[in-house]
Amino acid sequence: MAEGFAANRQWIGPEEAEELLDFDKATQMNEEGPLNPGVNPFRVPAVTEADKQEYCKILQPRLQEIRNEIQEVKLEEGNAGKMKKKRQRRRRKKKAFKKMMTDLEDRFRKLFGSPSKDEYTEIEIEEDPPKKEKRVDWDEYWDPEEIERMLMD
């Protein structure tokens, strides 16, 4: 049986088996509590090398399951960092867009919001001076989700 695993590079030896069972025991204690965590047969004081090899043969299916669980967790952790980078990039783009929009708003206010002195005098004669303009709320003109989609592309 060991020859078949060795040919496929899937055979788990005593050292790795000991670590995998320690991981399984720690996971079990974390999820179910420390009442009955079980015993790692590789850590029994009087175990011989032949006994360890025998345990490896017997426990191969369970050891393979534990190894696959660990690999899945590593894959999920790798993706977590990727999502964090995406969130940071999205925040930077939103911040840059917000700054750009406030700059544009200030420019428009300077261009169209405050009349020149000559026009102001004429307007003052005809009507009351214009009231202070409210700051433009761009959410009314732009859909924030649409802007976010444009920025993320």
Swiss-Prot record:
Keyword Phosphoprotein attributed: no
Major location category of this protein: host cell
Compositionally biased region (Basic residues): 82-97
Record's keyword terms, sorted: Host cytoplasm, Host nucleus, mRNA transport, RNA-binding, Transport
Motif (Nuclear localization signal and RNA-binding (RRE)): 84-95
CC terms in the record's Gene Ontology section: host cell cytoplasm; host cell nucleolus
GO MF annotation terms: RNA binding
Record's keyword annotation contains Transport: yes
Region (Disordered): 24-43, 78-97
Pfam families: Env-gp36 (PF09590)
Annotated localization: Host nucleus, Host nucleolus; Host cytoplasm
UniProt record, GO biological process: mRNA transport
InterPro entries: Envelope_glycop_lentivirus
Subunit structure of this chain's protein: Homomultimer; when bound to the RRE. Multimeric assembly is essential for activity.
Function: Escorts unspliced or incompletely spliced viral pre-mRNAs (late transcripts) out of the nucleus of infected cells. These pre-mRNAs carry a recognition sequence called Rev responsive element (RRE) located in the env gene, that is not present in fully spliced viral mRNAs (early transcripts). This function is essential since most viral proteins are translated from unspliced or partially spliced pre-mRNAs which cannot exit the nucleus by the pathway used by fully processed cellular mRNAs.
Entry note about domains: The RNA-binding motif binds to the RRE, a stem-and-loop structure present in incompletely spliced viral pre-mRNAs. This region also contains the NLS which mediates nuclear localization. These overlapping functions prevent Rev bound to RRE from undesirable return to the nucleus. When Rev binds the RRE, the NLS becomes masked while the NES remains accessible.
Record-given protein name: Probable protein Rev
The organism of origin for this protein: Feline immunodeficiency virus (strain San Diego)
